[in-house]
Amino acid sequence: MSKRTLASLTAADLEGKRVLVRVDFNVPLDGNGKITDDTRIRAALPTIRYLSESGAKVILVSHFGRPKGKPVESMRLTPVAERLSELLGRPVVKTTDAVGAGAEAQVAATSNGQVVLLENVRFHAEEEANDAEFAKALASLADIYVNDAFGAAHRAHASTAGVTEYLSPCVAGYLLEKELQYLQAAIDNPQRPLAAIVGGSKVSSKIGVIETLLDKCDKLLIGGGMIFTFYKAQGLSVGGSLVEEDKLDLARSLMAKAQEKGVQLLLPVDVVVADKFAPDANAKTVAIDAIPDGWMGLDIGPESVKQFEEALADCRSVIWNGPMGVFEFDQFAVGTEAIARSLAGLTRKGATTIIGGGDSVAAVEKVGVASEMSHISTGGGASLELLEGKVLPGVAALDDAA
């Protein structure tokens, strides 16, 4: 289902109009309240700049953290407003609340081209409840709605879905449009062979993705802690590694489905095991059928990396979601980092490489190859749900393309 986008609105449509833009500024802060990664803020800049340069009054709305429906001082958007102001090279007005008389007055005083950031929308419980009156109050601040928050598009909240009942037009911003184009095309119309790399600790959190990808891809490479559930399902001893005992039958059925569909399903052949879950653990590499009792697998081994790289070599499209090991610990980050470098090499050869949100994004950034990927998704849960073939409420609520 194609949606109307910001590109369909000209400067004449936008000049002097109040445009409510849902952005995803849920960025990480350090202990001193300083932003440690401004990727999500930067990702929204093309939409903000286009609106501002077209003479619109730009009103940004975002959530930040989980304040549970009440104001929390450490979750105010002040550091975000400061960083955005630096990136835009102009002042950004931050309101003291997302709705109400104060916000209304500050928006009313806004001149064409100016940018206003509303205070954390989740300070109101009505946001996550998709309350109609709250949505109406947000909508009253604007004439036009733009959703550029892919990271929150899988939520039916007041600022992502409810407001669209009271504003028109409602369109996708540049970031949301790009996300949908890349992820949808990768699933619906990929250049083949298409490989999917799925990692992370639990099969349970990736069931939907694996099942959908088995219908779409030519090769499925599995890494991360979830591999041990597959091994145990095959009758192997996994030592003290993480296993979801209640998912053994599911693992067997996924392996059977891959075989039935002719999908090459690759599991690691060796793993790096540790005597404890810690950065300074004793570690060694063993074959998957030789994990010692009491030791736990925390990364894929060098033979597995080689095998994965060989499987990926001829692929024209690759989707990656989830790390190969516990990459927060340097000695167990080798597998994840090797896959990141391998994908950068594939991009250089003309393949389409898509990093589907979450920890995989942190991995390619840590290795310094983020700019060499075709597309890096800004949404964790949203990209997973899109890859699962689900309809995202924040997208469904937008106007259909003419």
From Swiss-Prot:
One Pfam family named in its UniProt record: PGK
Highest taxon listed in the record's lineage: Bacteria
A GO cellular component entry from the record: cytosol
Coiled coil: none
Annotated residues for binding of ATP: 206, 297, 328, 357-360
EC number per UniProt: 2.7.2.3
UniProt main location, coarse: cytoplasm
Record-level Gene Ontology MF annotations: ADP binding; ATP binding; phosphoglycerate kinase activity
PROSITE patterns with a match to the protein in the record: PGLYCERATE_KINASE
Protein's UniProt keywords contain Kinase: yes
Binding site for substrate: 24-26, 40, 63-66, 122, 155
Recorded metabolic or biological pathway in which this protein acts: Carbohydrate degradation; glycolysis; pyruvate from D-glyceraldehyde 3-phosphate: step 2/5
Subcellular location per the Swiss-Prot or TrEMBL entry: Cytoplasm
GO biological process terms held by the UniProt record: gluconeogenesis; glycolytic process
Complex formation: Monomer.
Family: Belongs to the phosphoglycerate kinase family.
Name under which the protein is recorded: Phosphoglycerate kinase
Taxonomic lineage of the native organism: Bacteria, Bacillati, Cyanobacteriota, Cyanophyceae, Synechococcales
